[in-house]
Amino acid sequence: MKKLLLGAAAAALLFATPARADITVCTWGTITGPDALVNGMTYGTADYLKYLNESKGGIAGEKIKVLMLDGRYKLDEELKIYRRCADQEQAVVINGWSTGASKALRDQIQQDGIPFISESFASEVLDPEKYPFTFIAGPTYEQQMIIALRDLAAKGGKNVVLMYSDNEYGRGPVNVVRDSGVIDKLGLKLVDLVEYRYDAQDVTAQMLRIKAKNPDLVYVQGSTPQLIVALRDAAKAGLPTKLFVGNMYNISPAIPEQLGAAAEGFRAIQTYSFFGDNIPAMKEIEEYAKKNEVEKKDIYFIKGWLKGKVIAAAIESAIKKAGGKVPADIKAFRKSVRDEMEALKDFDTGGITPPFTFKDHQGSVQARVAEIKDGKYAPVGTWINAR
């Protein structure tokens, strides 16, 4: 198992190469903490860049220095890590984590001029004109929610409950969808908004309240740990699992593993291929795994591998534009990487998503509904455009 080296900021440092740091990439996530069940995307990005170091000698003959850091899902820790990456480490690209940190940093990122890929799918950090250095890697939380609402409307359902955590990750997307009027436009009725503590270990009271509303759909804007609690207590309250739909961060093997039969029928929005699918990117992962341990074998690792591909492609293009050498001016290098990331067109993701163009800073917006059947997630619909 990879060893975590904890510094003064309680940050985990992995994969730092001894080579000169001409190309430094920082990626942070919840390596330890309440959201650790979905941290495969942090490992995936770091592992892809390590894969390039091992298989191709890095980028343009230069090894990539990769810092994988632990933000512990604490805003103050994430802000400290950002400053470390931007200033001391002179990172050319930063891959951040939470919605709260991404929103808190969104103006600073533009001032610093550092390409920043957020793990958050919040629409409030996605604006190529206002936030030209910020990117995400898939449909926004709001777009994912609307897919579930469209699916309900198409099936003749009516009553909707939106359940969400008491933080930026939970409230922000729910407020955007509620205020957009899309629920009414689809002929649906919002019968309740139910908030819960992000670290709650019991939501039975909320489930009894939801049961009294007799909904046709309960959309949960929460991460995997919260979904496990919600579905467990829904079963106690006599609410069918099939009523519940979650976002991309609810496609975790931990849900059926921990809940067993109580997870059957739960649905979530799928935005990437599954780990183990017969796609070219999986062949790369298998090659990497011959010499290295892959700790996170899930869809989040696949997302991370995709982000690694995007980061590497943008850096490689920037170096080519500079005559094949790493630019000495870090500000100019960062700006060029940002420009090349935005310029990615018909980008081949190795089957993780359809080829995409990154001009909108979002990449692929393809998504579909997946349902837990016999303990595993299985697609129950075709890929659709989330816009």
Question: For each predicted feature, which ranges?
Answer:
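Extracytosolic ligand-binding ectodomains
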Residues: 4-10, 21-387
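Sec/Tat signal peptide C-region and signal peptidase I cleavage site
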Residues: 15-21
